[in-house]
């Protein structure tokens, strides 16, 4: 078995839908998922590896890059239906949903467009992308969400992109594991599979 710590929304929206492929290839390996939203020490847990958004430089670990975090500004169709010609500056007049783990995300997004908005830090603050996504779907505000977490919501029309602009945040997603487990057969099989899945996903992006 493999004990894997993973940020919950990534697990639910990206990893779990693909995990059946790994189970088909390796039916004798069970992958146990535990929710982790903050950095931790492997020595304090029973985890073999983790998928984390942030810095890969954890002491005593090795890592495999998975993908960048490309944030898209989205909202519910009902919230934006009367504003069909939105420009980036117009978004400041709509409620902005904030992420407690990325408190300056909207400011960085606006600045990437050369804009400085007075109320860019205001708005309801939430910890997880899953919660923020649901709040946006229910019309409670605009959200900045990584595209790979909301592809189905965009496809089904539950969320709509507000303008054609993706902001690459300073966070990247990595597969991280203790260096002493580098030769672990189960971990190596999962790492190889995950790397292939992430590479396929990245190459399919426009």
Residue ranges of model-derived segments:
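Buried hydrophobic side chains on well-structured beta-strands
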Residues: 1-4, 91, 175
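Central regulatory/effector-binding core of bacterial HTH transcription factors
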Residues: 1-59
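Short loop or secondary-structure boundary microenvironments that flank
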Residues: 8, 100, 177-180
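A bilobed periplasmic-binding-protein/Venus flytrap-type ligand-binding module shared by bacterial periplasmic
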Residues: 74-77, 173-183
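Short amphipathic alpha-helical coupling segments at ligand-binding clamshell hinges
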Residues: 14, 146, 182-196, 202-204
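C-terminal regulatory
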Residues: 40-46, 56-170, 197-206
């Amino acid at each position: 078995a493999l004990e894997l710590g993973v940020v919950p929304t990534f697990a639910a929206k990206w990893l779990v839908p693909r995990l059946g492929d790994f189970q088909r290839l390796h039916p004798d390996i069970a992958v146990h998922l535990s929710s982790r939203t903050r950095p931790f020490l492997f020595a304090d847990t029973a985890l073999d590896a983790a998928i984390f958004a942030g810095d890969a430089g954890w002491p005593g670990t090795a890592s495999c890059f998975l993908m960048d975090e490309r944030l898209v500004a989205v909202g519910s169709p009902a919230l934006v239906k009367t504003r069909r010609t939105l420009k980036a500056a117009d978004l400041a007049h709509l409620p902005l949903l904030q992420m407690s783990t990325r408190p300056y995300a909207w400011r960085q997004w606006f600045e990437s467009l050369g804009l400085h908005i007075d109320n860019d830090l205001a708005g309801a603050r939430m910890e997880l992308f899953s919660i923020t996504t649901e709040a946006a779907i229910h019309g409670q505000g605009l959200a900045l969400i990584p595209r790979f977490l909301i592809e189905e919501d965009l496809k089904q029309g539950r969320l709509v992109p507000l303008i054609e602009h993706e902001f690459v945040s300073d966070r990247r997603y990595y597969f991280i594991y203790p260096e002493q487990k580098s030769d672990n057969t189960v971990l190596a099989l999962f790492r190889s599979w995950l790397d292939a899945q992430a590479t396929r996903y990245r190459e399919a992006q426009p």
